[in-house]
Structures are given as structure tokens and as C-alpha cells.
């Protein structure tokens, strides 16, 4: 999957695939690193990769829970959300 410039360029479904690729360690080491760095960059969430590897509270580490956490944090901090579609 081609990585996009910002979180607003992704639908939730598209971004879920990136999270699944990270969780499942898909691709070679460089691809895994690129996906993780991209996740951290576009989400802008202060917990970064901990959202996946060390989830807290109601986040069970599933792709759906990670997306929910990102959406809630971005909305609470006046940041744009995912592309509709």
C-alpha cells in the first residue's frame, strides 16, 4: 500500500490496513520500519507506537481500538480526522 501524506488522506479502512500490517509484521524489515514511522508521524498521537504495542485503558490493541483512540484524541485536540468514504 502506498503511504499517504496525512491522516486526512486515508479512510479508516485504508489506515486499518497499515495498522494490521504493523501488528502482523508484514513485509521486510525496511517496510515494517517505514509503516511504523509513518503511523507515528501521521497520527501525531503522543503515545505513538505504544497505541499498538502497549495499549492502555479501553484500547485492547486491536486495529479498531487503535483507530478509535486516534480519532478521539485528534478530535479532542482540534486535529482533522480520516477521509470520509
UniProtKB/Swiss-Prot annotation:
SUPFAM superfamilies in alphabetical order: Colicin E immunity proteins
Gene3D superfamilies linked: Colicin E immunity protein
InterPro entries listed in its UniProt record: Colicin_E_sf, Colicin_pyocin
Keyword set includes Nucleotide-binding: no
Pfam families: Colicin_Pyocin
GO biological process, any: bacteriocin immunity
Keywords attached to this entry: Bacteriocin immunity, Plasmid
A GO molecular function held by the record: toxic substance binding
Family assignment from sequence similarity: Belongs to the colicins ColE2/ColE8/ColE9 and pyocins S1/S2 family.
Protein known as: Colicin-E8 immunity protein in ColE6
Species in which this protein is naturally found: Escherichia coli
Lineage of the organism: Bacteria, Pseudomonadati, Pseudomonadota, Gammaproteobacteria, Enterobacterales
